[in-house]
Amino acid sequence: PYIRDDGSTDNTIEIIHNYLLLDNRIIFCEKLEKHIGPQKGFIGMLECVESELYMFCDQDDVWLPTKIQLSVDVYNDIYVKNPCKPIVVHTDVAVVDENLAVLESSHWLSCRLNPDELKNYNYLAICCYTQGNTMLFNKEAKKISFPYSGEFMHDWWISTRVIKSKGIIKSIYIPTLLYRQHSNNVLGFKYGNSNRIFYKILNITNVINDNLEFYKNIRKDNYGSVLKFVWYKIR
């Protein structure tokens, strides 16, 4: 495993060095640029590492014991029939609070999301369900993800490159990690009331502004007209 730190000011570096003493397989990428945020941080680290398969991990996630083996088994079944294709395997998550109390046992179910219905670029670009810390992807998927534009989240970028290249995204409808939702998340889930229609109606101005800002970003990826965006957003 490879670790990078984005410029922590607490005792994170000390914790990392303690892990290095415990396991010589861990590599600390200390020389990578700092204070660049999650998307550039993950992509920058990906660019430096050569492997057959890749997985991302956030520092406060709790991986369930079956996470790696389940993802690898599903990947291997796909790879046997598609040895040259970019492949992404990803899973559902359970959302928990700071003390690991469950807020959502299935994030997909809570959001009424069926990833298998969203596997084309027009949908995926506006509803990127492939969460980075659940993904396992191969070197072919890495290869087509560079050069990186620098303007999009790492999981969105890799997943949309795979779809655009006619690769394969496979969804596993089993939570494989506990996603910790707390006040210090750089990026967090919306859960409960914030996913409900009445909440969005009551906060319609924010919803519209958020969607307009998001459209401006994906337009840079040649998404198409705002009418197309609205059509796929409401379908």
Question: Whereabouts are the PLM-identified features?
Answer:
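Catalytic core of nucleotide-sugar-dependent glycosyltransferases
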Residues: 110, 179-219
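Membrane-interface aromatic/basic loop that binds lipid-linked glycans or pyrophosphate carriers
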Residues: 220-235
